Amino acid sequence: FDAAVLTEVIEHVDPPRLAALEDAVFGHAAPAAVLVTTPNSEYNVHYELEGLRHDDHRFEWTRDEFAAWTHKISELYGYAVRLHGIGEHDPETGSPTQFAIFTREVSA
């Protein structure tokens, strides 16, 4: 596969099942690139929310939590990762949406 896109998907997966999704996408499909977006929970204060952004979200990550997850995935499955924000950036809470671009590292 050339690429996989998980746009606003991972937060809908029950945490105990997240490892299966990770393995299916990064381990078995193993595309050259994977694009992942997910809400930034820190930004929820701008929406005056208590809790998750939507009722069907199983979790929402802070920027640090998302970064830790992306780095775990990159090390485990051999991908480089770049992190970005999508939407208006607030200096204290970051952007509303987090964006990771994974690219498969090629062995020399």
Please give the residue ranges for each predicted region.
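S-adenosyl-L-methionine-dependent methyltransferase catalytic module, highlighting the catalytic core
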Residues: 1-6, 13-108
